[in-house]
């Protein structure tokens, strides 16, 4: 991938419709925990909320869109979600 290709894929801030997908253990309150953390760091569009469980029910995926303001904000969101101990991956 050329430097030009990398630049063309860079996020332009603010990004009004930035998708966040959070994968974690299926536990009571997982969705609410994700929403609470995201709401502390960004404006969250709850109308985009989607939730799914893995085939065996071990993992849950919560996806929604936020207003992304900066790389630092996205880093802080990732750190806060991972600090819960129930989040396995943030995409």
From Swiss-Prot:
It holds the Pfam family DUF493. Coiled coil: none annotated. InterPro entries: UPF0250_YbeD-like, YbeD-like_sf. Transmembrane segments: none annotated. Gene3D superfamilies: 3.30.70.260. GO terms for cellular component: cytosol. Belongs to the UPF0250 family. This is UPF0250 protein PSEEN4821.
